[in-house]
Curated annotation (Swiss-Prot):
The keyword Transmembrane helix does not apply. SUPFAM superfamilies: ACT-like, Ribbon-helix-helix. It comes from Campylobacter curvus (strain 525.92). Its cofactor is Ni(2+). This is Putative nickel-responsive regulator. Ni(2+) binds at residues 79, 90, 92, 98. GO terms for molecular function: DNA binding; DNA-binding transcription factor activity; nickel cation binding. The lineage of its organism: Bacteria, Pseudomonadati, Campylobacterota, Epsilonproteobacteria, Campylobacterales. Transcriptional regulator. Binds 1 nickel ion per subunit. Keywords: DNA-binding, Metal-binding, Nickel, Transcription, Transcription regulation. InterPro entries: Acetolactate_synth/TF_NikR_C (IPR027271), ACT-like_dom_sf (IPR045865), Arc_rbn_hlx_hlx (IPR013321), CopG (IPR002145), CopG/NikR_regulator (IPR050192), Ni_resp_reg_NikR (IPR022988), Ribbon_hlx_hlx (IPR010985), TF_NikR_Ni-bd_C (IPR014864).
Length: 137
């Protein structure tokens, strides 16, 4: 691990109260741990802007599995994808709805394009792309 450098941050008291509440609710050992996670998250999100290196994304979907031809359209998009599909996980939520996660690897723009194509299909009720990258720090 790198050397830890201490620095100070000035916050309005109300914001500090909210910070302390989040630290406690989420079980962080300290404000520093919480702050480090926030900084890492910001760096990862910013790394997606115009990134050309290989990144990771997880597309979470909820869809109606009885929707006409939805599964076939999803499969066509997956098979034609310009990204690597690392794995998929399928859960039957109830008789009508399925939850699926698709773990993707590739360039940011290509992952986002893939996700947008799937999310736009009729019968997809919810779609969220979680952006990830292996921090270089």
């Amino acid at each position: 691990m790198d050397n830890i450098i201490r620095f100070s941050v000035s916050l309005p008291s109300q914001l500090l109260d909210e910070l302390d509440k989040k630290v406690s609710e989420q079980g962080y050992a300290s404000r520093s741990e919480f702050t480090r996670d926030l900084i890492r998250e910001k760096i990862v999100n910013d790394s997606w802007k115009d990134a050309k290196e290989e990144l990771i994304g997880v597309l979470t979907l909820i869809y109606v599995h009885h929707q006409n031809d939805l599964i076939n359209k999803m499969m066509d998009i997956e098979h034609d994808a310009d990204v690597t599909i690392i794995c998929t996980n399928h859960v039957h939520v109830d008789h009508h709805n399925c939850l699926e996660t698709i773990t993707l690897r590739g360039e940011a723009a290509k992952i986002e394009h893939f996700s947008d194509r799937i999310a736009g299909l009729k019968g997809v009720k919810f779609a969220k792309l979680t952006k990830a990258a292996v921090p270089k720090f």
